[in-house]
Amino acid sequence: MINVNEFRPGITFEFENEIYVVISAQHSKQGRGQANVKAKVKNLRTGAITIKTFSGGERVEKAHIEKISMSFLYNDGVSIVLMDDSTYEQVAIENTKITWELNFLTEGIKVKLRKFNNEILDIELPAKIELKITSTFDAVRGNTTTNPTKRATLETGYEIDVPLFIKEGESVIVSTEDGKYVSRA
């Protein structure tokens, strides 16, 4: 059992016959009232992200998730295909379960497949990924008041804001948690 006061990003738990992973947790206490915990959680079966409120001290069942190292092979439009690095076994996961993760998948990238009692749930990406910029426009002179950025399209089709000095064809490091530019590769 896990006390909800110990919620941290990445903790997995069972609640109301569903399996969740904590994305973020905020603890609050009002005056004389009981403390509560607002947790932004992702349902690992459906991929839905919701906010759940728990009263302080409440306990939930820990979900023991098996993580298997795999390589991304390809996306056929309906599902992605992964290959186990040790057994060469291939596994397909529906795109509807991993809509956010699709923004960062490139051929050969290493991911972790999450399983619960032999049920395939979803994938876990590395915290930061190197991706190539396929298109961006040149900076406009004089548009440099405070921390100027411009839109850029990555090789996966995902769009991010990058600093003005980044050019088309360069590689950048992107955070997979919030989808933002981190640094030049």
From Swiss-Prot:
Protein localization: Cytoplasm
One of the GO BP terms on file: peptide biosynthetic process
Any one GO CC term of the record: cytoplasm
Cited InterPro entries: Elong-fact-P_C (IPR015365), NA-bd_OB-fold (IPR012340), Rib_uL2_dom2 (IPR014722), Transl_elong_fac_P/YeiP (IPR020599), Transl_elong_KOW-like (IPR013185), Transl_elong_P/YeiP_cen (IPR001059), Transl_elong_P/YeiP_CS (IPR013852), Transl_elongation_fac_P (IPR011768)
GO MF assignments: translation elongation factor activity
Major localization class: cytoplasm
Listed PROSITE patterns: EFP
Assigned keywords, A-Z: Cytoplasm, Elongation factor, Protein biosynthesis
SMART domains listed in its UniProt record: EFP, Elong-fact-P_C
Pfam family, one: EFP
Full protein name: Elongation factor P
